[in-house]
């Protein structure tokens, strides 16, 4: 099998100082780092600064149970009054609305009760007829389990829409009462009550318990799983390569190569995969133990542990494959995929419906979003498959297969083509240079010793 040929020039001691005076030496690290940080800033800030401006098909449920016409009028006005591109107003039954909320497919709902029209008529009649009555009411419910910011947007939108609807209903009711009384003047309290007749109540659907960080615990736990896979793969790859003798190990001032083990690239990658599997089993358990100790509610403990193991393995194996295939560049690619593009497209802190289209496109395949869906389903939504868990399992599995195929096939090809992990040409050249210098020093010492011996042998002969 052919051996890879050195492609590096031997080191030139005279070039040591000159090399750091070139534009390339200073420009390359600055440009690469600046580009990476610029992308980080643009992506992170671009995804969160204008959620209301970026709204698109934001789902809100409306339940009209009113037996009379007033509920339908409010519903029609609500649907017509809100931008159809920004909001997805779903007029559904009570059971369907509950399903949407339980699966995080709606951020809030408006409920119009069965007696709304009759209560509205009685309230109008009470303006001119003595007697006690109650204001007709509707209820706005937000869904923090789908997302805290999303629930806030839903509540704000429905509150503003109902303020407009309340004024319109008040105008119609005032005109109706005026027609019935022949235009007789009303008391100030009656006129004020008729102008805004609807009592808009606000509430929370299935509130989150204490210990969830106002709905952020799912996001941070998902982030921990992703970092365990990504960061773990970097640490494992570095240590394994050092222990096998293919990269130097530096501990403070100590710089050393371990005795090199004869092993192929593919076998090395298999070792890293095996360590990542073991690390995933332990890390997921440690995460759950710490979370429980800190008071985080974990309703489905072993299921969350199992999915955590699966997610860490998928991310860790894929990241290890990228590092093995691309070398040092694999670290930047992994960071780009799992962290830089992943966090703003997770749909955790800002709902995807309130982010620019680019992030919604990223969320279709980005690992962070899939892991978040799985963790949120297990922590907040009773582990329902239709609440994101099935999608999380499916796409996490796809990512795992991609990582296995990418690393396995390409490292195997590297081995077949002869791109073995032999000591680099630079190290060989340095060793040869050191050996040459050592031989030169020995030669000088031998020459000096010979001259000294010759001089000593000549001195007695001159004396005689």
Name each model-derived stretch.
Residues 229-281:
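Juxtamembrane interface at the cytosolic side of transmembrane helices
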Residues 2-211, 215, 413, 417-464:
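Extracytoplasmic/periplasmic domains immediately adjacent to an N-terminal transmembrane anchor
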Residues 272-278, 286-444:
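Membrane-spanning alpha-helical segments of multipass transporters and channels
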Residues 19, 258-262, 297:
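Helix-boundary and loop/linker segments of multi-pass membrane transporters
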């Amino acid at each position: 099998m052919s051996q890879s040929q050195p492609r590096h020039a031997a080191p030139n001691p005279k070039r040591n100082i000159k090399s750091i005076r070139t534009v390339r030496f200073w420009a390359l690290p600055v440009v690469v780092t600046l580009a990476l940080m610029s992308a980080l800033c643009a992506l992170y800030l671009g995804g969160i600064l204008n959620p209301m401006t970026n709204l698109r098909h934001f789902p809100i449920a409306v339940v009209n149970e009113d037996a009379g016409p007033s509920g339908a009028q409010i519903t029609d006005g609500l649907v017509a009054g809100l931008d159809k591109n920004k909001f997805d107003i779903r007029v559904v039954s009570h059971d369907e609305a509950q399903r949407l909320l339980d699966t995080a497919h709606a951020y809030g709902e408006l409920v119009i009760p069965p007696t709304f029209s009759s209560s509205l008529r009685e309230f109008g009649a009470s303006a001119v007829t003595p007697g006690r009555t109650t204001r007709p009411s509707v209820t706005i419910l937000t869904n923090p389990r789908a997302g805290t910011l999303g629930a806030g947007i839903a509540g704000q939108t429905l509150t503003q829409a109902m303020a407009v609807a309340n004024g319109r209903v008040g105008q119609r009711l005032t005109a109706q009462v005026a027609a019935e009384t022949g235009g007789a003047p009303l008391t100030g309290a009656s006129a004020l009550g008729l102008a805004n007749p609807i009592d808009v109540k606000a509430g929370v659907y299935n509130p989150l318990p204490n210990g969830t960080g106002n709905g952020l615990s799912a996001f941070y736990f998902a982030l921990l799983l992703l970092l365990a896979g990504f960061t773990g793969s970097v640490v494992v790859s570095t240590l394994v390569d050092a222990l096998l003798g293919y990269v130097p190990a530096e501990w403070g001032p100590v710089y050393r190569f371990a005795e090199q083990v004869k092993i192929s690239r593919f076998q090395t990658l298999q070792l890293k995969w095996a360590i990542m599997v073991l690390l995933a089993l332990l890390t997921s358990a440690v995460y759950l133990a710490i979370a429980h100790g800190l008071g985080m509610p974990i309703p489905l403990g072993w299921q969350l542990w199992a999915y955590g193991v699966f997610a860490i393995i998928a991310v860790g194996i894929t990241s290890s494959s990228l590092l093995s295939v691309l070398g040092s560049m694999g670290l930047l690619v992994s960071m780009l995929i799992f962290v830089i593009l992943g966090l703003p497209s997770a749909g955790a802190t800002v709902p995807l419906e309130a982010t620019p289209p680019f992030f919604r496109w990223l969320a279709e395949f980005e690992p962070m979003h899939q892991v978040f869906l799985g963790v949120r389903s297990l922590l907040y939504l009773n582990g329902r498959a239709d609440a994101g868990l099935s999608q999380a399992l499916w796409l996490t599995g796809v990512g795992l297969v991609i990582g296995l195929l990418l690393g396995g096939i390409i490292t195997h090809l590297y081995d077949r083509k002869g791109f073995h992990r032999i000591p680099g040409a630079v190290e060989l050249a340095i060793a040869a240079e050191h050996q040459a210098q050592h031989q030169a020093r020995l030669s000088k010492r031998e020459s000096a010793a010979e001259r000294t011996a010759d001089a000593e042998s000549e001195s007695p002969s001159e004396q005689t």
